[in-house]
Curated annotation (Swiss-Prot):
InterPro entries: Atg22, Atg22-like, ATG22/LtaA_families, MFS_trans_sf. One of its GO terms (cellular component) is vacuolar membrane. Gene3D superfamilies: MFS general substrate transporter like domains. Residues 38-59, 647-672 have a biased composition (Basic and acidic residues). Belongs to the ATG22 family. This is Autophagy-related protein 22. It is found in: Vacuole membrane. Residues 1-66, 634-672 are annotated as: Disordered. It comes from the Eukaryota. Vacuolar effluxer which mediate the efflux of amino acids resulting from autophagic degradation. The release of autophagic amino acids allows the maintenance of protein synthesis and viability during nitrogen starvation.
Amino acid sequence: MVPRISEPQLRPEPHRAPSNSTKLSYTSYSSSFEADDERSSSADHDSMGPDIGSAHRDVPAQYAGEDTRLTSRKELSGWYAYGFAAEVFVICGIGSFIPITLEQLARENGVLLSDPTQPCGSSSTHLPPGLNPGNAKDSQCVIYIGGLQINTASFAMYSFSLSVLFQAILVVSISCAADHGNYRKRLLLFFAFAGSITTMLFLTVVPKVYLLGALWAIISNTCFGASFVLLNSFLPLLVRHHPKTQYGTPDFSPELHPSFVDEYPPEHSLGESEAEVYDERSALLSHNRTLSEAPDVTEPLPLSADSTSIELQLSTQISSTGIGIGYSAGLFLQCVSIIIIWLLKGTTFSLRLVLFFIGLWWFLFTIPAALWLRPRPGPPLPSTGNRNSKGSRSWLAYTIYAWSSLFRTVKLARRLKDITLFLAAWFLLSDAIATVSGTAVLYAKTQLRMAPEALGLINVIATTAGVLGAFSWAAISRALNLKPHQTILACICIFESIPLYGLLGFLPIVKRWNVIGLQQPWEMYPLGFIYGFVLGGLSSYCRSLFGELIPPGSEAAFYALYAITDKGSSVFGPAIVGAIVDGTGEIRPAFWFLAVLVGLPAPLIYFVNVERGKEEGARLAEIIEGFRIKDAEIASGEHSSTESISEDERGRDHREISPHDEEREGRRRNDI
């Protein structure tokens, strides 16, 4: 055993390249949740050189308690591990087996719509003589909840809508805690374990207590959405402190002894007062000022032209790798689930058992993330009055600040025509994506009488096509010389073919053929491929196009609005489809609504002008930055004469833009 060197020879820290999204500072205090990278094995050094993530760097702190140790390979592995753990829930759970299980549990408590005296039984059993899968209206099943007659397919759709509603509210409420204080990792683990345990609890749901299944679905989906928002909030920090970003070249990183950090006690805590009030982007974006008076004695390299591209490429690389790892886990577990269901003859117990394994997978592979991810605390919450008040750190303060930040961002977005058009289109498109998926699965189960293992195979095909589409649409766009918004329009047009194909089943001539128009189970497989292929293009190009329209310096706030629009929109589509099914007794009429929902975003996307949006965003960014600098100067002058400054005394919140001041600024620019 090699003895530990008590007095290591310290090497000087190498030059680092400054970056528009990076800032080095003191390390943070330790935490019980913190990854122990100080004594990593040599296995951790493969891809990033020496594991210098624990190296103390004697430079000014951006805010009290900041952890700016370099991102280590182990920390990246922890980030990937959670994607590997949780992605199976959305692919195998919400995307496939949870709606099937909810419908089946309700069906075993329901009666036939055509004959209320007859119990429904399983929807995957053989059809009565003379009844083909495409016109199985007489096999529709209903349950009664609180005196209301609800179709069993609608029951699953309503449950999903409620889960998305709670998810959207929770995501907004915790967004501030994700960026401020030391709650990011703790909340991630709380929601991860809560969601995985409730998913495992599906094993205990018997048909007599089928409503409990809806409760578990709502809780698990809400926890999943919240945990992924928290996981994504780690990405900018991992990129910011990555050696490739800090030292300006992909292959250069310093070599410091791993135990060096042990000799330096923490110098700040989150409870200390600050000389500067930070806005909601503090944890994700860089600032031009630091709190510490200690000078940065390192000699930076000249700022290279590709400094920003290094960060962008690294962020894309890490994100893409995480998505690939998550999809691989989802596909693997989906195949295992299909085998389990096939071996157990597609019983309700087999569905519950599969959901138990999905929750167990989520739980077990969250443990490496808990061990390897660092907390990476954000700046303390900006106080709104007495800076010594503990109320500024209370959960109520976090929640109020989160919602007020959202409203401020909405006010800014309303001033940008192209962002408004895009967000309206994305709201409809995101709702259409979620609603088409859930409707198709339930249509295949209730009207085409497809077995659960066959439904699982549809999801495998769609997921595989999604991966293929993510890579293929870039090549298609280059080959056809399409602009980003034109590529999105092409995806929408292909997407529209899915509900239109389902509507062909209403044509008398097609009905006589007994094929085409979703009258046979095998027709679901090519449609599943189309859905996945289109989704791969929409996901990447919509986010990319939106990024082009964001005012520089407001990326975090606007991407939060983008995510909330994505999460919140799916409340409406499934609920409307459920109401249509309850009113007509069939799912096929819902394809009329889906056709409209898929088509509505197209004209909005068509009128988005990227160049105009960039110009508007740049002008707004100048106005925002001008008022931030002015407020910073006022705060600096007043802070020198008094220890505590109230925002009310200053006259306005430094994060808000005065419409009158903006109007005067616009007139001044026009005069110039």
